[in-house]
Swiss-Prot record:
Residues 81-125 form the WRC domain. Keywords: Activator, Nucleus, Transcription, Transcription regulation. The lineage of its organism: Eukaryota, Viridiplantae, Streptophyta, Embryophyta, Tracheophyta. Residues 288-298 have a biased composition (Basic and acidic residues). Residues 128-172 have a biased composition (Low complexity). This is Growth-regulating factor 5. It comes from Arabidopsis thaliana (Mouse-ear cress). GO terms for cellular component: nucleus. One of its GO terms (molecular function) is ATP binding. Interacts with GIF1. Strongly expressed in actively growing and developing tissues, such as roots, upper stems, and shoot tips containing the shoot apical meristem (SAM) and flower buds. Also expressed in mature flowers, but weakly expressed in mature stems and leaves. The keyword Transcription applies. It is found in: Nucleus.
Amino acid sequence: MMSLSGSSGRTIGRPPFTPTQWEELEHQALIYKYMVSGVPVPPELIFSIRRSLDTSLVSRLLPHQSLGWGCYQMGFGRKPDPEPGRCRRTDGKKWRCSREAYPDSKYCEKHMHRGRNRARKSLDQNQTTTTPLTSPSLSFTNNNNPSPTLSSSSSSNSSSTTYSASSSSMDAYSNSNRFGLGGSSSNTRGYFNSHSLDYPYPSTSPKQQQQTLHHASALSLHQNTNSTSQFNVLASATDHKDFRYFQGIGERVGGVGERTFFPEASRSFQDSPYHHHQQPLATVMNDPYHHCSTDHNKIDHHHTYSSSSSSQHLHHDHDHRQQQCFVLGADMFNKPTRSVLANSSRQDQNQEEDEKDSSESSKKSLHHFFGEDWAQNKNSSDSWLDLSSHSRLDTGS
């Protein structure tokens, strides 16, 4: 009991703070009073605190950091660098660069710009020369060889007329020239110039217009001497029977066929070599579109409907063309258009009657094809519509 009481007395008699600590507490309590009262703290109280920092007590409370402020440079949560002067480039595992770090940098000279794109090389810009692509187009030149050739659209000649057309449109173009669309006579030119056309006119030089095309095979492209305009036929894959209605020449009026506007088409068949050689009718019907005219005197029959000034020129033109072969050209194309025929028939009625008399001897062989009433109505003075309607009904029956 004595020992316990003696030990407890010793602990109670010992002060809780040392005199230095007590002095420090009093100094802090005084500063606190100034702060609570709102009065500025005297500077001597602050200086005393600064001096006390150098004491052993302060050194124990705030231990000296050997790294200094390096922790703020490395950032929070990072481990301190065990080797400060070494390059910090690693592979993410155990390997680390052994070189010395560059001054004011964490990496050496080799790894300093590793993050940047060092593979930038001066690429030589090769100037590629672009050649202009020219679309080839099908052209026909006005010479003795009318075979189609491919010519560039960028270098166009004035001596060649370019057509972008198919083979069917070529045949239609040859038929249109044979039909009188070239404008050889003055009446024909006046007719087509008075009507508005939707297709452009390719121009030709006068030297080319004087040349004529002699085609021994399937095509014949003809350009007359006084021709100032030609038709550029669209490249449509239509049948040959639709070419007679092209450019509004043979319009279908009330569903009337070609015999309404071309009643003289059947008459030209009598002048053909098929009739003179007395070939069977089945042969003519099987091959009606390949008609070769060798007798130029009988070809000139359809020129009697033109004016006297133009007929002399056409007669001279056909003397040079003694043999021509037309593909997809029916015999009705040997005759001029309905409007030209109507205008010229008033002036040359005597010549028309002579032609009827000359061809009357050869009508009987084709009566089984056109009907018996056709020959009677042919000599009558009915209108063209009546004649064609009778012939159409006869052939339909």
